[in-house]
């Protein structure tokens, strides 16, 4: 069947979706029975030069026009931010349109409200592109591992930070130089604060934790440290001890079912699979009670990998329209779920001291156990 969709875009991912839907339209039709057509596109600036050709007739700057268009069945939100995006997604759900979004900040901060609205309006939200770019980790948790109690998730889920730490480690660059290189190569934004502060990864961790444990984790219950305090000296000392430094997101439940969610620079043994994830790549280790340990690796950002996830969601949305029902996208099941504050969390620490009399510190022993 013909599925009309609209896009509201601000970044290159939207261009990637437009390009790749056109390029692989026949393949998608053969595999899914859905003929995807992007019928309207809302942008902030009509005059802006675009890397792909979009017919001027389908362009507008007013997304409300698109939500009001009865021929449109699916709305794709790729504008980022939380205020206007919240209005757009809410209006689309109220207009009974399926929503596809790649907006992790929006879901982390307003997810509980939006999924309740989706449930009330009887239309789903799809959000594969919100976490880890092209890695289909949302589908894994919602479908592939649905029979498992999730014991823990450990992930490198911010490509900017991983690129910076990799260059510091492998090329000996300072933090500032590595970040500048990441910006020049397009791995980091002009304002990289959200990435380097750890909050981009934390937003993704909130989504993964909420899916895994069935209740929405509040942002204030998440412990976040960025890589902006990591120096080349930290990395060199860690290497002498046999560790690599990664910005790691950790999600796990204790014996009482309290869920800890944190993102911080972490020492990983150099033999650990996550210690060997380099550059802008992402990787996520999910531990389930039935399946055991599983690993997912791939590009966590970029136009094509992220558009792959958006188009996957468009196909799922099309299947919902053609074949019928699906839940809102989030099924609450941890009705008594509680977060675990960082001050009750037990973990090992790395402390680097500058001492004036090394002899008096020789009785200190160095940690040799795994630090996660």
For each predicted feature, which ranges?
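N-terminal glycine-/serine-/threonine-rich beta1-alpha1-beta2 phosphate-ribose binding loop
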Residues: 5-6, 10-94
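ADP-ribose/adenylate-binding Rossmann-like module
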Residues: 93-109
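Rossmann-fold NAD(P)-binding glycine/threonine-rich loop
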Residues: 104-125
């Amino acid at each position: 069947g013909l599925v009309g969709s609209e896009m509201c875009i601000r970044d290159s991912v939207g261009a990637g979706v437009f390009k790749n839907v056109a390029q692989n339209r026949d393949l998608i039709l053969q595999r899914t029975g859905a003929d995807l057509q992007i019928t309207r596109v809302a942008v902030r600036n009509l005059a802006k030069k675009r890397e792909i050709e979009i017919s001027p007739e389908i362009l507008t700057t007013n997304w409300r026009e698109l939500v009001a268009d009865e021929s449109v069945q699916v709305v794709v939100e790729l504008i980022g931010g939380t205020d206007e995006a919240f209005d757009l997604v809410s209006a689309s759900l109220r207009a009974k349109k399926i929503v596809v979004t790649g907006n992790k900040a929006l879901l982390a901060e307003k997810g509980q409200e939006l999924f309740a609205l989706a449930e009330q309006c009887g239309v789903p939200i799809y959000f594969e592109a919100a976490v880890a770019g092209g890695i289909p980790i949302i589908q894994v948790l919602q479908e592939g591992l649905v029979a498992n109690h999730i014991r823990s998730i450990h992930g490198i889920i911010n490509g900017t930070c991983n690129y910076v730490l990799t260059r510091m480690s492998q090329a000996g660059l300072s933090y500032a130089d590595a970040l500048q290189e990441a910006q020049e190569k397009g791995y980091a934004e002009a304002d990289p604060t959200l990435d380097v502060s750890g909050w981009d990864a934390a937003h993704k961790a909130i989504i993964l934790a909420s899916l895994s444990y069935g209740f929405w984790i509040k942002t204030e219950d998440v412990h976040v440290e960025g890589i902006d305090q990591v120096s080349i000296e930290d990395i060199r000392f860690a290497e002498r001890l046999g560790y690599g430094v990664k910005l790691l997101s950790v999600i796990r439940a204790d014996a009482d079912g309290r869920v800890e969610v944190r993102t911080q620079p972490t020492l990983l043994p150099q033999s650990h699979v996550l210690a060997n994830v380099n550059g802008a790549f992402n990787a996520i280790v999910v531990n389930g009670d039935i399946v055991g340990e599983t690993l997912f690796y791939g590009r966590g950002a970029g136009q094509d990998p992220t558009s792959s996830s958006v188009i996957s969601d468009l196909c799922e949305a099309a299947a919902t329209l053609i074949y019928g029902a699906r839940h809102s996208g989030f099924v609450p099941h941890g009705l008594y779920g509680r977060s675990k504050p960082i001050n009750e969390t037990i973990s090992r620490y790395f402390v680097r001291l500058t001492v004036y009399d090394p002899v008096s510190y020789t009785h200190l022993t160095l940690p040799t156990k795994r630090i996660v």
